Amino acid sequence: MAKQAPDVGDYKYGFHDEDVSIFRSERGLTENIVTEISKMKEEPQWMLDFRLKALKLFYKMPMPQWGGDLSELDFDDITYYVKPSEHTERSWDEVPEEIKRTFDKLGIPEAEQKYLAGVSAQYESEVVYHNMEKELEEKGIIFKDTDSALRENEELFREYFASVVPAADNKFAALNSAVWSGGSFIYVPKNVKLDTPLQAYFRINSENMGQFERTLIIADEGASVNYVEGCTAPVYSTSSLHSAVVEIIVHKDAHVRYTTIQNWANNVYNLVTKRTFVHENGNMEWVDGNLGSKLTMKYPNCVLLGEGAKGSTLSIAFAGKGQVQDAGAKMIHKAPNTSSTIVSKSISKNGGKVIYRGIVHFGRKAKGARSNIECDTLILDNESTSDTIPYNEVFNDNISLEHEAKVSKVSEEQLFYLMSRGISEEEATEMIVMGFIEPFTKELPMEYAVEMNRLIKFEMEGSIG
């Protein structure tokens, strides 16, 4: 019996375009396919060796025994590499028309013109467009697609690649390491502070597609950078897989903010590994917005290696019908006087399931370290569920740990108060939800906050009745 495509409903990015790819690998994962990917990219031998070792690890490693249901994920039915065009273009006019129309619908050219210092657009397996303001190059900033960085900055690339997330980290990190393609590479030199965001946009267009970008960010001593990524995919009757790896190195006194606003269709498995090493007095901020997908499993991680290092995660997860958002954070305190903050906001409706899963670890050398965790969940109906699963490891007695968790429903008193002032029940519920997520949206640049609020409103439509 043929599968029915999920209802597009109000998912505004559910459109898909005709296949315009110039190359598409066979479905399934084999040594031949991994070798073919590497040869098409004309990679050095060491990268091919890295990929093949990762593939062997992937075969050996077990599937996660926790989190959402992965039993329907068929690795043999996925296309692991699709090349949409011949080159990464620096001019928007030179991007193939079919691909350009997709990104025009998503507002990428407009976004670049208005408020971005640099932008990268990935379609399927490859970055099809990349541009950066010239003055940033003059400051020594490197912002390239990851494949170009491997070719053009190999020494710097090799120094940091897989140093934060090795292939052996987990099964999906091994998978990414074997078939990675695209992503962003950023290097910010010492004491260079970049205030305007750099942005990347990742789009899956094909059915049964796997997207495996690899992002690597290095903020040198005293540097600062703000990076924003967005993700969407069409609605199909069969599943797609997004399995990215993000590695970030925050050197002494440096600052990195990494913002994600994902709005995947509800046929996408979103299984991502994100980790940063934070050195002395460095500061790492994860700002993570999770909407859509069939299943998201994502836990941004800060490893606080230097004295005074700081890490924070501010996240929102919204699960609707048939969706599981299994998200959270990991804070690993390895040095004295380190600090971390986790603020998790979750919303579930129409039978959706949200799970906060977090780890805070205090090592023996982490004297004077402190961590604060806040988990708030808003459940909009009786069919939806929420779980909070914290795990704390403490190996010294000179630390501070605070954890607060709260689950609530939209109360009749709140609704009555608003409805008595002429507001409909649906509008009142929406107002309560928007107030609930305000601590998240206020941390976004204005244009992203507007988009996030709009996406939440789309998700909210039809919540009453």
Curated annotation (Swiss-Prot):
Query: Looking at the Swiss-Prot or TrEMBL record, what is one Pfam family this protein matches?
Result: SUFBD_core
Task: List the residue ranges forming a coiled coil, or say none.
Answer: none
Q: What domain of life does the UniProt record list for this protein's source?
A: Bacteria
Q: What InterPro entries would the database entry show?
A: Fe-S_cluster_assembly_SufBD (IPR055346), SUF_FeS_clus_asmbl_SufB (IPR010231), SUF_FeS_clus_asmbl_SufBD_core (IPR000825), SUF_FeS_clus_asmbl_SufBD_sf (IPR037284), SufBD_N (IPR045595)
Question: Which biological processes are named by the entry's GO terms?
Answer: iron-sulfur cluster assembly
Q: What's the family? A: Belongs to the iron-sulfur cluster assembly SufBD family.
The protein depicted here goes by the name Iron-sulfur cluster assembly SufBD family protein SERP0500
